[in-house]
């Protein structure tokens, strides 16, 4: 109920005329303030008028006014700037830590909002607000999608900066971990990230001219060269890895971290590792090269690559496949661009103050086709137009950060749903 009161107050869904405090003072709401999701009062810098006197300060909201004392606000100086206390049930007076009384407003949550909120909270449908999607103004949808896209950019930027710190501010290292994670797609993302953290890129750089040695590094650190027996190529890689592991004091990851069940041969970790080995063998300073590419076609051409000859007819060291190149599909390339290249362009642009890179990142999303997954299909079935990857990224953000967390009160579509009668 308290969350709903926050919503009602923030959006002024209550009669604004002839408001009075619980002691009969005339009350006018000029500005409801800025919502605070952290510790402290619920709304900052509100502006109200009581009996003609303007007050600027904070707002605190409770279901019962006695909650003020239960939460210890009467002893906390942080709440001394509260100028209005709001409660559905006013069962006591409240005061600041210095004993001063605080004006109170008795505020009910309208019945239709309570009923609409229960509908959203109790439905198993996704999206829960599907009924109103076709009736929403295009401007409402467009502005919310734009905000969600930027929110996703900022969230990914924060994650990348954390990864950059982990890599001691080596952008190439952070990029390699991110790229590897996305080469694992949904099934092996965590395993690929762990694997990438086992790869000593400075050591790999010293042997980068040899694809065979890069493969020895990559497959050895993946834990895939532990069997004593295998074909000639496997045994050569194993011997090379033993030499490199001794030279650079390497230890491989646990091979059981890899998942193989229900994977197509071209999606097996071995194939993805071989593709990454080929990419790093032929693309020194990969991140720098990608930063210079101005078109999606150029990026695709750089990433597409292939593998060494051995992998043209293998998907593991034991498993053979029909002879043919093992290149990334168009849809896989698009996902890697969306989830790796675009976020890095944006993060690097922010970090270096290069607006051009940020604009290029957002522009790439508008050029790429939207992702095709359950989330996007469900929204499309509701009548929402998903035109490009920027839209699909916005909807993924909406699902993960609002729908899954039941944060309908903070969603603009949720706002439209709740206020309907």
What would you call each of these model-derived segments?
Residues 32-37, 45-50, 68-75, 90-96, ...:
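Catalytic micro-motifs at enzyme active sites that drive phosphoryl/nucleotidyl and oxygen chemistry
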């Amino acid at each position: 109920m308290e969350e709903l009161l926050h919503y009602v107050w923030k959006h002024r869904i209550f009669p604004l005329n002839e408001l009075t405090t619980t002691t009969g003072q005339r009350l006018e709401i000029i500005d409801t303030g800025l919502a605070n999701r952290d510790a402290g009062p619920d709304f900052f810098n509100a502006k109200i008028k009581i009996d003609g006197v303007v007050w600027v300060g904070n707002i605190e909201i409770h279901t019962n006014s006695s909650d003020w004392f239960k939460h210890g606000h009467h002893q906390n100086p942080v709440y001394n700037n509260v100028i209005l206390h709001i409660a559905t049930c006013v069962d006591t007076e409240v005061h600041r830590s210095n004993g001063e009384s605080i004006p109170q407003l008795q505020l009910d949550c309208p019945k239709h909002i309570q009923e609409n909120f229960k509908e959203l909270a109790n439905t198993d449908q996704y999206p829960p607000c599907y009924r109103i999607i076709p009736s929403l103004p295009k401007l409402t949808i467009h502005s919310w999608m734009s905000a969600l896209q930027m929110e996703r950019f900022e969230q990914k930027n924060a994650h990348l900066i954390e990864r950059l710190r982990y890599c001691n501010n080596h952008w190439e290292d952070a990029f390699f971990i991110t790229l590897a994670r996305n080469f694992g797609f949904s099934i092996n993302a965590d395993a690929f990230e762990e694997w990438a953290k086992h790869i000593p890129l400075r050591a790999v750089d010293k042997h980068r001219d040899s694809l065979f040695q890069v493969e020895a590094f990559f497959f050895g650190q993946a834990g895939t060269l532990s069997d004593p027996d295998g074909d000639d190529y496997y045994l050569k890689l194993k011997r090379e890895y033993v030499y490199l592991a001794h030279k650079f004091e390497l230890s491989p990851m646990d091979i059981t971290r890899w998942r193989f069940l229900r994977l197509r041969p071209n999606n097996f970790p071995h194939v993805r590792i071989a593709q990454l080995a080929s990419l790093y063998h032929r693309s020194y300073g990969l991140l720098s090269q990608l930063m210079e590419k101005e078109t999606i076609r150029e990026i695709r051409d750089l990433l597409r690559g292939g593998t060494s000859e051995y992998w043209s007819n293998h998907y593991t060291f034991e498993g053979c496949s029909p002879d043919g190149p093992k290149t990334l599909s168009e849809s896989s390339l698009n996902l890697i661009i969306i989830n790796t290249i675009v976020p890095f362009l944006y993060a690097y642009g922010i970090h270096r103050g290069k607006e051009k890179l940020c604009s290029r990142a957002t522009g790439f999303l508008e050029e790429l086709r939207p992702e095709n997954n359950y989330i996007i299909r469900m929204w499309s079935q509701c009548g929402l137009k998903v035109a490009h990857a920027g839209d699909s990224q916005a909807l993924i953000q909406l699902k993960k950060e609002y729908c899954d967390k039941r944060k309908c009160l903070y969603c603009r579509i949720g706002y439209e749903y709740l206020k309907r009668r």
